[in-house]
Design a protein with these regions (language model features):
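Short, small-residue-biased leader/transition segments that mark boundaries at the very start
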Residues: 1-8
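Residues at the starts of beta-strands that form the adenosine-phosphate
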Residues: 9, 39, 70, 99-102
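Short glycine-rich phosphate-binding loop at a beta-alpha junction
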Residues: 9-16
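Residue-level signature of catalytic and energy-coupling elements of molecular machines
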Residues: 12, 44, 100
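Short, glycine/charge-rich flexible loops or terminal/linker lids adjacent to PRPP-binding catalytic cores
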Residues: 32-71, 82-85
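Internal catalytic or translocation cores that form aromatic/hydrophobic pockets or channels
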Residues: 69-99
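PRPP-dependent phosphoribosyltransferase catalytic core
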Residues: 89-149
């Protein structure tokens, strides 16, 4: 229950795709353990990315009401920080949150931006030549984290 505070002003936001599944799991665990419900939303950051100019940007602008809410932003893997930067831009265009906390399943290091997770499932140092894949049963038919070259 660390930092839950006023649950009516809390919101969990998962970054599409695997972050959404992890966010829903987090929501269910908070409800099971604390007996409280916190809304959970899905966020597509494609239109806010700065590192994919070669491809057309797909998706809709963020419409999540973030005003005066404490947002728990959830993603599967934290790497360069660019996806999180895009998510922060999206959330800020939709309102002015009271605060934003970041929860990730895996932090693999190699930041290009000054971004740090508040909640980390596992730190897994990797090389730039490796990639980390998070598998979730809802999308992949299995659960697990693998490192690939």
């Amino acid at each position: 229950s660390r930092g839950l505070g006023d649950v009516y002003k809390r919101q969990i936001v998962g970054i599409e795709r695997r972050g959404v599944i992890l966010a829903k799991r987090l929501q269910a665990e908070i409800e099971r353990i604390e007996g409280i419900h916190i809304d959970c939303e899905s966020l597509n950051v494609a239109v806010y990315r700065d590192d994919r100019d070669a491809r057309p940007k797909e998706g809709e602008p963020c419409t999540i009401d973030t005003t005066e809410k404490t947002i728990i932003l959830v993603d599967d893997v934290l790497y360069t920080g660019r996806t999180i930067r895009a998510a922060l831009n999206a959330l800020m265009t939709a309102g002015r949150p009271r605060s934003i906390q970041l929860a990730v399943l895996v932090d693999r290091g190699h930041r290009e931006l000054p971004i740090r997770a508040d909640y980390v499932g596992k730190n897994i140092p990797t090389s730039h030549l490796e990639s980390v894949r998070v598998a979730v049963a809802d999308l992949d038919g299995e659960e697990g984290v693998t490192i690939q070259e």
